[in-house]
A protein has these predicted regions:
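Small-residue-biased structural context
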Residues: 1-158
């Protein structure tokens, strides 16, 4: 799918998100080797946590801060609601008991995939068609700046 240069940093993170969703789903369904995902539940939880810490939190903030004001109200609500649910599910996986962790990881993987597809197929094309080039350029510049900061923060945290 063709994506405007300005939104490519978010699309790149969506690619990472789809890989994590795929790995978690395969691992939880008993096929971890096919996706390179951890075989045990603690490893699967660690994968979700790493993704949350290194990508998801900053990604959520960037989308809501930079795109939210340009979207239709229903899309802004859905964006915020699904982001909150993704973070809630990672929290359950991180802090819950084993049965809850498995269920939360499964729900997280399914929602993550659905959410990314919605953004890439509907939300981003809408934004690209309704936001002028100058604003998209401003958004793209801010995304690049945030991406550099997020990578720097992730390196210093590890």
């Amino acid at each position: 799918m063709k994506r405007s240069r300005q939104l490519k940093p978010l699309s790149s993170e969506h690619h990472q998100a789809l890989l994590v969703a795929f790995q978690l789903r395969n691992a939880l369904d008993g096929h971890p080797d096919s996706a390179g995902a951890p075989k045990d539940l603690p490893g699967q939880v660690a994968l979700a946590r790493r993704f949350e810490e290194q990508v998801l939190r900053s990604h959520v903030r960037a989308e809501e801060d930079l795109l939210g004001r340009w979207l239709a109200q229903r899309d802004t609500r859905r964006l915020a609601s699904e982001h909150a649910e993704l973070l809630r599910l990672v929290g359950i996986a991180r802090d819950g008991a084993a049965p809850d962790q498995r269920a939360a990881l499964h729900a997280f993987a399914e929602l993550l995939e659905r959410h990314v597809h919605w953004e890439e197929r509907e939300l981003f094309p809408y934004a690209e068609g309704h936001v002028d080039e100058a604003t998209l350029a401003t958004i793209g510049g801010e995304l690049e700046r945030r991406l550099v900061l997020a990578r720097s923060d992730a390196k210093s945290a590890s």
